[in-house]
Amino acid sequence: MEADRGRNNKVRCAVVDTNVLMYVYLNKADVVGQLREFGFSRFLITASVKRELEKLEMSLRGKEKVAARFALKLLEHFEVVETESEGDPSLIEAAEKYGCILITNDKELKRKAKQRGIPVGYLKEDKRVFVELLD
């Protein structure tokens, strides 16, 4: 089900994955703006994912390098949270700990989050955010 423009108050916080942050620049999608329209007011990124973006900025070239740099600039609007785990598990840990939805285009990560009862969201091909809320 698509998010209902803020009428559902259960989920107000979003943990965002690297692939979504990179997609924002590469595909000119206003993910944060769309999530705000849906009533989300708190955006989290794990320290692990921030480090991953910093490494990508150093190692990538061309558009991807610029996308990583843009994503790091976008993080000025995010809370960086520490987790015990690294990488994808850190996103699941943060979503559980803070009661957030997980926004990712990683199919395996979405599957794992759903198994743990974490609501997920992702970007569709038309650049719109699709949010699957749990009942």
Curated annotation (Swiss-Prot):
Cofactor(s) this protein cannot do without: Mg(2+)
Domain PINc: 15-118
GO molecular function: magnesium ion binding; RNA nuclease activity
Enzyme Commission number: 3.1.-.-
Keywords: Hydrolase, Magnesium, Metal-binding, Nuclease, Toxin-antitoxin system
Binding site for Mg(2+): D17, D88
Pfam families per record: PIN_9 (PF18477)
Top-level taxon of origin: Archaea
Gene3D superfamilies documented for this protein: 5'-nuclease
Family per similarity comment: Belongs to the PINc/VapC protein family.
Assembly and interaction partners: Dimer.
Function recorded in the entry: Toxic component of a type II toxin-antitoxin (TA) system. An RNase.
Protein name, per record: Ribonuclease VapC9
Organism: Archaeoglobus fulgidus (strain ATCC 49558 / DSM 4304 / JCM 9628 / NBRC 100126 / VC-16)
Lineage: Archaea, Methanobacteriati, Methanobacteriota, Archaeoglobi, Archaeoglobales
